[in-house]
Amino acid sequence: MEFFSFLSDHYSHANLVDRALQLLKERIRRGDAMAYFLRGQLYFEEGWYEEALEQFEEIKEKDHQATYQLGVMYYDGLGTTPDAEKGVEYMKKIVDSPCPKARHLQFAAAYNLGRAYYEGKGVKRSEEDAERLWLFAADNGNPKASVKAQSILGLYYSTKEPKELEKAFYWHSEACGNGNLESQGALGLMYFYGQGIRQDTEAALHCLREAAERGNVYAQGNLVEYYYKMKFFTKCVAFSKRIADYDEVHDIPMIAKVTDCLPEFINRGMAMASFYHARCLQLGLGITKDEATAKQYYSKACRLNPALADELHSLVIRQRI
């Protein structure tokens, strides 16, 4: 029955897409300019990138949304050979456009352009230009601006040298208030360690638990560490196993897509959970001692994040965990 249900769902979706394309074709025939972009966007959403690229190229001089999508597609190599310089060129067109119709796209374009400058991809690397563009995109915490830019400013100010932790806390607070899951977990850690704000364990746990419930794997990994250090071993074992058993190949990209969290932090959360689960198994804390299985989880932690595993191992040697 499940197979037939799958077929039914598949064909009903295919029929809906076909019907939508027919309607858009009719709207185009009647001279509806917006229908060209909508057809390209439908191709894009369905993963028909070559058709989407062709459609957007056709209307790029008249439609700012098409220009923006072309920037994304050339930068990421969707439907074409990756061409970061061309992607950057299209994003700059949106950011620099004086046309009111481009205004709603400028925050997202500035965020993407900031990433390009920060990574030095398609343009000469410049942290100053990246910061300038992100500040524009963040628009003083405006919820209708780029919340991603607000969050990445929090990350930027907490990792640059010298660190500017009060600015980092401010931007993570703005992003969290606008619903950003990555920043909610980051706020929890800043409260926990008193970074950029007075230490507040209660506020930290509130942020971390809520972020963990919403799917932030890095927050989950840090809660595992907290449960271990507080000697809540039964809770630590159950929680850490669930996270450690994520599949590193398939689950990390999927979780990143669903939660909009950065893969590097998902990886770090999984590595933390794997290490502490291994430690509990090795010592028989909250679970029957099993050194063979412990080795498997230690290996997974090392595979996921060698630097973090080495850091945690040094704490074991110093009898800190």
Residue ranges and their predicted role:
Residues 92-94, 132, 137-138, 231-249, ...:
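TPR/TPR-like (Sel1-like) alpha-helical repeat modules
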Residues 104-112, 145-153, 225-228, 253-273, ...:
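TPR/TPR-like alpha-solenoid helical repeat scaffolds
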Residues 46, 81, 124, 160-162, ...:
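Structural motif corresponding to the intra-repeat A-B loop/turn of tetratricopeptide repeats
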Residues 41-43, 67, 72-76, 94, ...:
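Hydrophobic face of amphipathic alpha-helices that form TPR/SEL1-like repeat modules
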Residues 30-33, 61-67, 76-78, 97-99, ...:
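Short helix-capping/linker turns of helical repeat alpha-solenoids
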